Amino acid sequence: MEVEPPLYPVAGAAGPQGDEDRHGVPDGPEAPLDELVGAYPNYNEEEEERRYYRRKRLGVVKNVLAASTGVTLTYGVYLGLLQMQLILHYDETYREVKYGNMGLPDIDSKMLMGINVTPIAALLYTPVLIRFFGTKWMMFLAVGIYALFVSTNYWERYYTLVPSAVALGMAIVPLWASMGNYITRMSQKYYEYSHYKEQDEQGPQQRPPRGSHAPYLLVFQAIFYSFFHLSFACAQLPMIYFLNNYLYDLNHTLINVQSCGTKSQGILNGFNKTVLRTLPRSKNLIVVESVLMAVAFLAMLMVLGLCGAAYRPTEEIDLRSVGWGNIFQLPFKHVRDFRLRHLVPFFIYSGFEVLFACTGFALGYGVCSMGLERLAYLLIAYSLGASASSVLGLLGLWLPRSVPLVAGAGLHLLLTLSLFFWAPAPRVLQHSWIFYFVAALWGVGSALNKTGLSTLLGILYEDKERQDFIFTIYHWWQAVAIFVVYLGSSLPMKAKLAVLLVTLVAAAASYLWMEQKLQQGLVPRQPRIPKPQHKVRGYRYLEEDNSDESDMEGEQGQGDCAEDEAPQAGPLGAEPAGPCRKPCPYEQALGGDGPEEQ
């Protein structure tokens, strides 16, 4: 009986073919080592490297799209819910039937105060929170707080609405500061992954040239604001598909309104106290709020699962290791920089113009003349105009960077002057297309303003150790402007337009003055970022260069090393410790060069 041959040949065993396999390669002890453990014969290192960095670039694009979509859904849910609840709570019949003498108007005023007043303190804690949690996790936490605010509207009481509104007010500035930092970091990463060969030639610790990431930053900011401005349109979906079915027409709601536009005083003076024909059933309200809650939860999952980290783990350790006291002080120290001081009026105007579009123009001009049932379509016109015009921020690829900002300011200047002399008659719809046209044009100016400012800050402050401070200052001033608008909501329309006009002119003049100073070669004074102080000296911190060292500090360090004498070889042929590097513990033990003996 013949023995069946083994399925696999035994190494070193002589078979019918001797000590060679079917490819003619010797088997057993004489087999060459390269044939066993060598590289794959068809492996192309350059092609694999190209594919690797292509996947990295696609990952960066995925991060930008996920962050943009998450913020769009979050703000669409937040603005839509807030608008729907304020309209329902305004109707006195709804308040009396649903809530009796609970004092719903007082709760609403406290809720709005929590949303608008709390961000004033954000400058004190935002950089600390971003450095403590990290950029991505700060975004996730802030989006979760927005979802918490949505969930509390299931049970509308003082102890649910007001605390959640205060928490939401605390999360506004951290969300936007971390988002601006995140988009800027993604543009820098995309540059690194696109020019990886240059990075290999220059060395891993060499910073890329100044402004090299600017083209990618322009594209990513245009994508982000194209998505974000759609949130104003998404916020109108509950109004269109649900609330408009219960509203009275303009002949009832505007029966006592005498003047609109530039002649108006406060917010809708004389507006009817009853705006609902029939009261919506509680079951229908729960269904709408459940849909909004599901969308908010989806936004949380998108930020959590699809957004990658903005920094490497070692970079985040370095950013936190400068000291919490320094992190707290650095936003205030950056006021020394004349560029930030010149941009503060633009920061304030950026907050003014968004609130004016959503409250001043939409209510004082649009609703006052066309009725509450057309508010949603007016804001959709603003949203679509702003979203489509965010692409105009790409003009910075071919034109000077001041062109988008100045163009947006010029457009808003013309519209503001026109609104000074426009007082539309109440309950007149013959020229309703003018309202939609003005809203769309205002959206164009808003898009140029937002994309221009965010791109400018990302170009002027591209050091990763400064970006969270800069975007915190930017959005804190926006929050201050929104607080001022909240305080002045009862002013006459002419006073609001005058404040808007003066701020706009001052912002444009201050910005052009800043650009002139930069062209003259005036060097801004920036605070020094302290070096990381690590409690544990691991292998990561024995590298030659510090990942958080600025260019000026690096040049000074190299100059100091050039003056020093060449280090002598240690015992047993130990190699020199390298320029500007302390000896590792092993070298200190061999050479007696530890800190105790210096």
Curated annotation (Swiss-Prot):
UniProt topology in membrane: Multi-pass membrane protein
Transmembrane segments: 64-84, 110-130, 132-152, 160-180, 223-243, 285-305, 343-363, 378-398, 403-423, 428-448, 469-489, 495-515
Gene Ontology annotations for the cellular component aspect, listed alphabetically: early phagosome; endoplasmic reticulum; endoplasmic reticulum membrane; endosome; lysosome
Induction remark: Upon interleukin-4 treatment in B-cells.
Result, substituting F133 to A/W: No effect on interaction with TLR3
Cell compartment(s), UniProt: Endoplasmic reticulum membrane; Endosome; Lysosome; Cytoplasmic vesicle, Phagosome
Positions where Phosphoserine occurs in the chain: S547, S550
Result, substituting R281A: Strongly decreases interaction with TLR3
Entries under InterPro entries matching the protein: UNC93B1
Compositional bias per record (Acidic residues), positions renumbered to this chain: 544-554
Result after altering L148W: Increases interaction with TLR3
Stated consequence of mutating Y154 to A/W: Strongly decreases interaction with TLR3
Keywords: Adaptive immunity, Antiviral defense, Cytoplasmic vesicle, Endoplasmic reticulum, Endosome, Glycoprotein, Immunity, Innate immunity, Lysosome, Membrane, Phosphoprotein, Transmembrane, Transmembrane helix
Modification comment: N-glycosylated.
Impact noted for substituting W137A: No effect on interaction with TLR3
Family: Belongs to the unc-93 family.
Protein name: Protein unc-93 homolog B1
Native source organism of the sequence: Mus musculus
